[in-house]
Curated annotation (Swiss-Prot):
It comes from Anoxybacillus flavithermus (strain DSM 21510 / WK1). Its EC number is 2.7.2.1. GO terms for cellular component: cytoplasm. This is Acetate kinase. Homodimer.
């Protein structure tokens, strides 16, 4: 059975998951953090046991070498040759990539060229790709893009009402993100509903520290809440979501900050952190709200309220909806947020059971059996989607 590794490289981190394919059995997973520092942390889980090591890891190539050596040392693989495919998460594929792609010198250059669209993420993803090429040069590698699933959006969804030449010259448009997650949970929802995805109108709510909503009709994304960048859409942990663009020069004028500094505030100091003044972590906010902290309660209402509005908007866009899906850290685990989001949607045919809504972190229907619109909790699995694409594109199946 081929072994395939799914990789998510950040600027100073490397997440990994090793699969036996096509059974999709997870052999091990882990993360290398603080790459580039003397006190880098190597975490790996084997047979449910977590192993942690603190050691200097100067760069991603060293992290990759260490990871592979560790797999042999722990007896997970006998030799590097057992790894037959590598899948890399790449945040931005622009308009160039509407599907995952086998990485060649040419496609790698194209991914690098897209870095101005995702300056925080794509360069780190490229570093991860190059590190694996250095250590395992002959193993086929596949890039899986966060944006690819949303490339089916029609122009009316992805165009901004700006001068049209900005789109033609600079590629300014809505791209959307979390595509691999939205694709996984909508495909899984169709399986759980026992209906062909081609017949379904689904609304997928990926709610983590970053959050996005997607309208998926017939298995294709037709609209999503994030935009040209992951800053757009609903309020998030530290991101503002949609605001009036004229606020940017106004804040600059009032505070003396530069445009870059204001964008940094919108990305890192806004959202629920900005509203509460103390945390972007939903668990802290729910705890504070339960103790009567009014700003914490307000942050929850703002967060859930924006999601609630997107659901109404996307239901209108698709002339109805068959199921609403909650996924990612908050979507899978917070019954409080789900309840606030779903409150008042009975007019649309959404009837949910408060007892079933107590579920955390596992697949479940939380709607009543008679509810015309089903509501599901589905833990996302982006890594398995990456592994499946490696099998498909590297012809390992």
């Amino acid at each position: 059975m081929p072994k395939v590794i799914a990789i998510n490289a950040g600027s100073s981190s490397l997440k990994f998951q090793l699969f036996n394919m096509p059974s999709e059995e997870v052999l091990t997973k882990g993360v290398v953090e603080r790459i580039g520092f003397e006190d880098a942390i190597f975490n790996i889980t084997v047979n449910g046991e977590k192993i942690k090591e603190v050691t200097p890891i100067p760069d991603h190539a060293v992290a990759v070498k260490m990871l592979l050596d560790k797999l042999i040392e722990l007896g997970i693989i006998q030799s590097f040759d057992e790894i037959e495919g590598i899948g890399h998460r790449v945040v931005h594929g622009g308009e160039k990539f509407s599907d995952s792609v086998l990485i060649t010198d040419e496609t790698l250059k194209e991914i690098e060229d897209l870095s101005d669209l995702a300056p925080l993420h794509n360069p780190a993803n490229v570093v991860g790709i190059k590190a694996f090429r250095e250590v395992l040069p002959n193993v086929p590698a596949v890039a899986v893009f966060d944006t690819a699933f949303h490339q089916t959006m029609p122009e009316q969804s992805f165009l901004y009402s700006l001068p049209y030449e900005y789109y033609e010259k600079f590629g300014i448009r809505k791209y959307g993100f979390h595509g691999t997650s939205h694709k996984y949970v909508t495909q899984r929802a169709a399986e759980l509903l026992g209906r062909p995805i081609e017949q379904l109108r689904l609304i997928s709510c990926h709610l983590g520290n970053g959050a996005s909503i997607a309208a998926v009709e017939g298995g294709k994304s037709i609209d999503t809440s994030m935009g040209f960048t992951p800053l757009a859409g609903v309020a998030m942990g530290t991101r503002s979501g949609n605001i009036d663009p004229a606020l940017i020069p106004y804040i600059m004028q009032k505070t003396g900050k530069t445009a870059e500094e204001v964008i940094d505030i919108l990305n890192k100091k806004s959202g629920m952190l900005g509203l509460t003044g103390f945390s972007s972590d939903l668990r802290d906010i729910e705890e504070a709200a339960a103790k009567g902290d009014q700003r914490a309660e307000l942050a929850l209402e703002v967060f859930a309220g924006r999601i609630h509005k997107y659901i109404g908007s996307y239901a209108a866009r698709m002339c109805g909806v068959d199921a609403i899906i909650f996924t990612a850290g908050i979507g899978e685990n917070s019954d409080i947020v789900r309840a606030k989001v779903l409150r008042g949607l009975e007019f649309m045919g959404v009837y949910w059971d408060p007892a079933l809504n107590k579920v955390r972190g596992k697949e479940a229907f939380i709607s009543y059996p008679h509810s015309p619109v089903k509501v599901l909790v589905i833990p996302t699995n982006e890594e398995v989607m990456i592994a499946r694409d490696v099998m498909r594109l590297a012809n390992l199946a």
